[in-house]
UniProtKB/Swiss-Prot annotation:
NCBIfam families in the cross-refs: L18_bact
Keyword Cell cycle appears in the UniProt entry: no
UniProt family annotation: Belongs to the universal ribosomal protein uL18 family.
Keywords: Ribonucleoprotein, Ribosomal protein, RNA-binding, rRNA-binding
GO cellular component, one term: cytosolic large ribosomal subunit
Molecular-function annotations in GO: 5S rRNA binding; structural constituent of ribosome
Pfam families documented for this protein: Ribosomal_L18p
HAMAP family with a match to the protein in the record: Ribosomal_uL18_B
Protein name: Large ribosomal subunit protein uL18
Length: 117
């Protein structure tokens, strides 16, 4: 099993459990150059809020979009947008990525901005 298929297997298992809970989830996806975050409705069919380093407003503030500072900016932005829509509690879906580095920086920034998980 290669690295990508192992990550996808872990993500699928976690998403199955989150679906059983019926919780709104904060989904993170990372690439070497960018990081993306979305808040998805409990039914899984609707993206309620999204933020990423691809967005011009966030990308212009950063020197480089593939580091922990960029992840923290995305975490803060997604949390602020979620709170504006009345979403305060979510389940964190790390998409099979290790809870370390950029994924952890995004989660910590979202918590500091007021999102609870």
């Amino acid at each position: 099993m290669d690295k990508k298929s192992a990550r996808i297997r872990r993500a699928t298992r976690a998403r199955r459990k989150l679906k059983e809970l019926g919780a709104t989830r904060l989904v993170v996806h990372r690439t070497p150059r960018h990081i993306y975050a979305q808040v998805i409705a409990p039914n899984g069919s609707e993206v309620l809020v999204a933020a990423s380093t691809v967005e011009k407003a966030i990308g212009e503030q950063l020197k480089y979009t593939g580091n922990k500072d960029a992840a923290a900016a995305v975490g803060k932005a997604v949390a602020e947008r979620a709170i504006e829509k009345g979403i305060t509690g979510v389940s964190f879906d790390r998409s099979g990525f290790q809870y370390h580095g950029r994924v952890q920086a995004l989660a910590d920034a979202a918590r500091e901005a007021g999102l609870q998980f």
